[in-house]
Design a protein with these regions (language model features):
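ATP-dependent adenylation/nucleotidyltransferase module used to activate substrates
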Residues: 1-163, 204, 219, 237-247, ...
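Mid-to-C-terminal catalytic subdomains of enzymes
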Residues: 148-154, 158-202, 206-211
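Flexible glycine/acidic-rich beta-alpha junction loops that bind and position SAM and/or redox cofactors
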Residues: 173-185, 218-222, 255-262
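Short glycine/threonine-rich loop-to-helix capping motif typified by GTGT followed
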Residues: 186-192, 224-229, 261-268
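C-terminal boundary motif of the adenylate-forming
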Residues: 208-215, 253-254
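Long, low-complexity, intrinsically disordered segments
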Residues: 284-298
Length: 298
């Protein structure tokens, strides 16, 4: 606890160096903590800025707006246009660089127009162990990562958020919709809409952490293992709702949800002829790259 208190003080010192700031605000656990501390130190000189585009999952903008209201910070929404960038749409491994370049350019323009001195993000030290092309864009634009400067891990961010009474302390990790599409597969507005609508439906069933990975006419569902039985229980509803979206095959990844995974398309199973595949009564553990097939078995 003493170490965590020391890190919190480092976080405060990092933010207090600035007279005003714009927080790149997704409404996730990390940026919410940054916004909360910034508001305590720079009340009236902090603005939460959320980027809106087709890659933002449904409901996240509304959640971000409500969080900003709870904290007491002005919330601004800026439109970004990464989906018009051919480099972004190509969906190479460095896709995030082009997204973040666009986002920070727009936030930078806003900050300059409003006399805001600094742009803060919610990167934490655990994120530095991942391959993050977007980090280069942040550095190029002079974006400050106060959680990194305070050496705060994701777990510590959650603990501090809990102590502050923030509702995001246990919020599942966020990621843009494009992360559901394997690298090398071009991104389209249609594919983004497909995964967004599919995930939105699954959440109405009570599923917690969820990703619907897009593999053409195949949807690969990743949920926490505790939710496997819930998918089985609603197998007919899943089929009914996924088919109109263009998903003729539905598969459950037996390893469950994994953050930041971008796997190649699943191997074909059975006939190559597109068929309706319902959720079966058995979820079989099949080593990757094979995935659990959801079929008509009873």
């Amino acid at each position: 606890m003493i170490l965590l208190d020391s890190k919190l003080e480092n976080l405060r010192r990092t933010i207090a160096r600035h007279q005003s700031c714009a927080v790149a605000f997704s409404g996730g656990v990390d940026s919410t903590l940054v916004l909360k501390v910034a508001h305590e130190l720079l009340a009236g000189k902090v603005i939460a800025v959320t980027a809106l585009s087709e890659s933002l999952p449904s409901g996240e903008l509304e959640e971000a707006a409500e969080l900003a209201r709870i904290i007491g910070v002005e919330h601004v929404v800026i439109q970004t246009f990464e989906t018009r960038d051919k480099d972004y749409l190509a969906n190479a491994a460095n896709r995030c660089y082009f997204c973040k370049t666009e986002m920070y350019a727009r936030i930078g323009d806003f900050a300059r127009d409003h006399g805001i001195g600094a742009i803060l993000d919610g990167l934490n030290v655990d994120d530095l162990t991942d391959r993050r092309p977007g980090r280069a864009a942040a550095i190029e634009r002079g974006v400050i990562s106060p959680l990194v400067e305070a050496n705060l891990t994701k777990a510590e961010v959650r603990e501090l958020s809990r102590e502050f009474g923030l509702p995001t302390w246990d919020k599942p990790a966020l990621a843009c919709l494009s992360s559901r599409i394997p690298h090398g597969t071009p991104i389209t507005l249609e594919s983004l809409s497909q995964v967004d609508r599919a995930e939105r439906f699954l959440k109405t069933l009570g599923v917690g952490q969820v990703r619907v990975r897009h593999h053409g006419d195949t949807a690969r569902i990743e949920v926490e293992p505790v939710d496997f039985s819930l998918l089985h229980e609603h197998r007919s509803d899943i089929q009914t709702n996924f088919k109109p979206l263009g998903f003729l095959r539905v598969e459950i990844d037996p390893d469950g949800y994994r953050c930041g995974v971008s796997l190649p398309a699943p191997l074909a199973m059975g006939s190559n002829t597109p068929v309706d595949i319902q959720v079966g009564s058995i979820i079989r553990s099949i080593p990757l790259p094979l995935l659990t097939r959801i079929d008509n078995a009873s």
